[in-house]
């Protein structure tokens, strides 16, 4: 309760300007809200904090060891277990310290810093994924709203023309077939509106999953700047993560290679005897690598194999990101061409047909059914154009929001 309340308060403050003015929400505002409330980004930040804290101790020496004991304590005879009767019995206290060379500590620090870099990339990746998913949900919600406007317009047209047909039928200037056809058309329009409302509800639920609120109106997404192929591949989340994994593997291999030189341990102890002089002992422990080719070198070879694996994974990820960019860019270009052709070849003629049918009906030469069909065809053309524009916007978002940015959510 104490953890969730401050986060809810922060979200409420972020939403306050929108809720107070009830202004249409923009894409950038939605992205900012989504990143602030993203739990995946918060989890990634916690991972980065953990790695950062661990890195602070990477180059430190191990803790010293306190050693306390009794040497040469009698175990048999009349003086057994007595610490003050035998001259050889000595109470001892000392301290030992394992020593790591500066090179080893530097290697461990570099490996820890590489791990921090990897976790930082994961924070950026979580924020970028949240922004991309939010932008896609925004596009779906925006175009669902626009499609609903067209569906309601078509329903309004069908209602108008059905009422006009009934009026003509009551005045004996119309016919029942026309009225029945328009009644069926109105029912179809109402069903289409219900279908679009269902789609709008699904899009709104997806939008709420990221932003937490579904406004009545969204601003048009506007132009979306697209990256170059080189920038897309370099900042692709998978490629960036693989680059960090490669760096971690290299640093880890360096740490393992440094273990071929053993760590020395020095020790100093003070011994107290009864009736005799106290003593001081000083010593150094040096591990002896008796078979480095079968132990230390094997460990290093294992780590170097992981470096090679990371290099191959990075190369494969770069190829996949390049193919992904080219596929999305090709889809975007084809959609742009289709939109231009469809607008010129279908939408404009459909509008001209509606104008001609309206003029013909006004002059008494055309029928209400012909007018409705012309209006319906124009609205359908506009809905198809909206679908193409939505697909283009979603493709552009995949291109623009997939790569990592320098901005990391606070």
Residues of each region from the PLM?
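Acidic, low-complexity, intrinsically disordered peripheral segments
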Residues: 1-3, 76, 384-410
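Periplasmic alpha-helical coiled-coil/stalk elements that build and connect Gram-negative outer-membrane
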Residues: 2, 25, 126-237, 328-335, ...
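Bacterial Sec-pathway N-terminal export signals of envelope proteins
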Residues: 21-70, 75, 98-99, 107, ...
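Solvent-exposed loop/turn segments connecting transmembrane beta-strands
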Residues: 79, 271-279
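Residues that define the transmembrane beta-barrel architecture of outer-membrane proteins
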Residues: 87-91, 276-280
């Amino acid at each position: 309760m104490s953890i969730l309340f401050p986060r809810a308060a922060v979200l409420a403050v972020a939403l306050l300007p929108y809720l107070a003015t009830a202004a249409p929400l923009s894409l950038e505002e939605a992205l900012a809200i989504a990143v602030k409330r993203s739990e995946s980004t918060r989890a990634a930040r916690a991972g980065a904090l953990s790695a950062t804290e661990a890195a602070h101790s990477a180059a430190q020496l191990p803790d010293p060891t306190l050693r306390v004991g009794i040497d040469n304590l009698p175990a048999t005879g009349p003086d057994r277990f007595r610490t003050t009767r035998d001259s050889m019995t000595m109470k001892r206290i000392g301290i030992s310290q394992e020593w790591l060379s500066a090179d080893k500590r530097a290697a461990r620090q570099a490996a820890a810093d590489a791990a921090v870099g990897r976790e930082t990339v994961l924070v950026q990746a979580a924020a970028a994924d949240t922004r991309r998913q939010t932008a896609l949900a925004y596009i779906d919600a925006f175009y669902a709203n626009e499609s609903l406007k067209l569906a309601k317009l078509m329903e309004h047209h069908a209602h108008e023309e059905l009422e006009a047909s009934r009026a003509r039928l009551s005045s004996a200037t119309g016919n029942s077939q026309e009225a029945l056809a328009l009644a069926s058309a109105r029912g179809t329009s109402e069903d289409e509106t219900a279908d679009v409302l269902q789609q709008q509800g699904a899009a709104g639920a997806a939008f709420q999953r990221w932003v937490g609120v579904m406004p009545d109106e969204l601003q048009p997404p506007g132009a979306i700047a697209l990256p170059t192929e080189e920038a897309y591949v370099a900042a692709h989340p998978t490629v960036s993560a693989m680059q960090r994994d490669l760096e971690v593997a290299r640093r880890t291999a360096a740490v393992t290679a440094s273990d071929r030189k053993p760590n020395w341990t020095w020790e100093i102890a003070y011994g107290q005897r009864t009736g005799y002089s106290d003593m001081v002992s000083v010593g150094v422990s040096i591990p002896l690598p008796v078979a480095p080719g079968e132990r230390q070198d094997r460990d290093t070879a294992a780590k170097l194999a992981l470096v090679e694996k990371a290099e191959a994974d990075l190369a494969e990820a770069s190829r996949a990101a390049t193919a992904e960019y080219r596929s999305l860019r090709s889809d975007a270009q084809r959609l742009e061409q289709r939109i231009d052709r469809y607008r010129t070849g279908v939408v404009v003629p459909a509008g001209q047909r509606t104008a001609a049918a309206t003029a013909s009906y006004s002059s008494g030469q055309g029928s209400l059914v012909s007018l409705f069909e012309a209006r319906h065809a124009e609205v359908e053309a506009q809905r198809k154009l909206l679908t193409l524009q939505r697909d283009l916007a979603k493709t552009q978002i995949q291109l623009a929001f997939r790569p990592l940015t320098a901005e990391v959510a606070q």
